Amino acid sequence: MTADNAIYIPPYKADDQDVVVELHNRFGADAFVAQETRTGMPVLWVKRAQLKEVLSFLRGVAKPYSMLYDLHGVDERLRTQRRGLPAADFSVFYHLLSVERNSDVMIKVSLSEGDLNLPTVTGIWPNANWYEREVWDMFGIDFAGHPHLSRIMMPPTWEGHPLRKDYPARATEFDPYSLTLAKQQLEEESARFNPEAWGMKRHGANEDYMFLNLGPNHPSAHGAFRIVLQLDGEEIVDCVPDIGYHHRGAEKMAERQSWHSFIPYTDRIDYLGGVMNNLPYVLAVEKLAGIQVPQKVDVIRIMLAEFFRITSHLLFLGTYIQDVGAMTPVFFTFTDRQRAYTVIEAITGFRLHPAWYRIGGVAHDLPRGWDKLVKDFVEWLPKRLDEYTKAALQNSILKGRTIGVAAYNTKEALEWGTTGAGLRATGCNFDLRKARPYSGYENFEFEVPLAHNGDAYDRCMVRVEEMRQSIRIIDQCLRNMPEGPYKADHPLTTPPPKERTLQHIETLITHFLQVSWGPVMPANESFQMIEATKGINSYYLTSDGGTMSYRTRIRTPSYPHLQQIPSVIKGSMVADLIAYLGSIDFVMADVDR
């Protein structure tokens, strides 16, 4: 599948200073304070008075920063390593991405505790809506002019802002929980949908609208997800997605786990992604520490990541076809997933949540006989994909339910922060494995599947083709697995080689400290994004020179994908919404974190 109107994406240039020159020419060098980081992009602090003007300039500049990739905050009050940075009790960052430049820039603004106010940027990027709501929810920072600034992760009745440093991180620091009848009634009432609060009318000129709760326990909602539909008969007039039911405070947990002990928590972000979740985190930590991993580590990581891309896509394929009415294929795709998990379990020791990647390497070397297991799977799956394509994906009913349904173009996808197959189905050839290679992906031969209609059918077909390309990558890993160590020889990777601990007391002492306290990472900031199973996933880490992260920001692809739903589905039928939800490919743990 190819697109005839694909955007040209230039080679990636880390820490591209061209935009800094443009900003200095427009606003003057004195308007910015540059921050040295290991994020791989320019990081510039601006004054609040100029924030919106600067962001508007970047949105409208030649080869614009069309995507607000991320927006969130940091409680700076306990941060000790801030030399050269503007005084701040809190800060908010705006991570902007330009596909046409293939580069990023981060704009930061400082705030004092007594004046936590910023202008909304929802008029510049529509997807700022949820991000600003989350910043208010987590930090209590107000965004003037926001259309509906309210809780998004926490319940409406929640008190406090959890990502503030003075907010407890442990349940034992709270009073014992009790649910009285009065409190239960209050919680139930707070969940009642109020159309007027969202600018919706209960009546039209000639009709009364019905408001329908789809979820949070509907099978087609794919998790604890609620979407309130405003209906005129079967037609969707408007809708309001409601998330947060699966929120576990993953970013708060990261502040009280050592750099190593947080790895198992990453598995549970996209709980179908397995080690794919480990990868951006360990790469970001390795940037902080300046760790270079052996080539064998890169190849092993890529091989296992592509295995989990396949298992995730197989589950998507089976459940997607099931969503539109065909029951049989899901049993076949789950059988194929089991074959993949047999290989994964043999290599890592676990199935869904191996927590197998390590800072500086992987947990252990490949086991004896791994190559035969991988070879058998590589030979098996292509024939199965051919069968799925012929028997299910060419089915006239499935095509009728999905072709032309829930379509959007590249411009709309970028404005809403859509990545992954949802973006490439519009013809935009942006896959980080090609556009910004990491972990040695530049050494592999594979194609980036594209489509051009941007509808529910194209999103499915792109993922099917991605599985074929993953097989190509795994086959190259099988044929070209390097010799050598499975972890870096670096003092911040644990544990060190056992024979060295038996000979050198300093090595043993260092090992003891790192196991008991955890490794101490240099004070700095780092960032890593990867092409995960559902789109671009990234970790933005702030170290204050300690054994734990000062701030861990987890940006997941499913979050903006759900925010986009109302703009795509208005005017469609309820049945079309079911097909659309299935085509997004999301899990709520990835959305809610």
Curated annotation (Swiss-Prot):
Residues 1-184 are annotated as: NADH dehydrogenase I subunit C. Keywords: Cell inner membrane, Cell membrane, Membrane, Multifunctional enzyme, NAD, Quinone, Translocase, Transport, Ubiquinone. Transmembrane segments: none annotated. It is an enzyme of class 7 (translocase). GO terms for cellular component: NADH dehydrogenase complex; plasma membrane. It is a peripheral membrane protein. It catalyses: a quinone + NADH + 5 H(+)(in) = a quinol + NAD(+) + 4 H(+)(out). InterPro entries: NADH_DH_suC, NADH_DH_suCD, NADH_Q_OxRdtase_suD, NADH_quin_OxRdtase_su_C/D-like, NADH_UbQ_OxRdtase_30kDa_su, NADH_UbQ_OxRdtase_49kDa_CS, NDH1_su_D/H, NiFe-Hase_large. The keyword Translocase applies. Pfam families: Complex1_30kDa, Complex1_49kDa. The keyword Lyase does not apply. It comes from the Bacteria. NDH-1 shuttles electrons from NADH, via FMN and iron-sulfur (Fe-S) centers, to quinones in the respiratory chain. The immediate electron acceptor for the enzyme in this species is believed to be ubiquinone. Couples the redox reaction to proton translocation (for every two electrons transferred, four hydrogen ions are translocated across the cytoplasmic membrane), and thus conserves the redox energy in a proton gradient. In the N-terminal section; belongs to the complex I 30 kDa subunit family. NDH-1 is composed of 13 different subunits. Subunits NuoB, CD, E, F, and G constitute the peripheral sector of the complex. This is NADH-quinone oxidoreductase subunit C/D. It comes from Pseudomonas entomophila (strain L48).
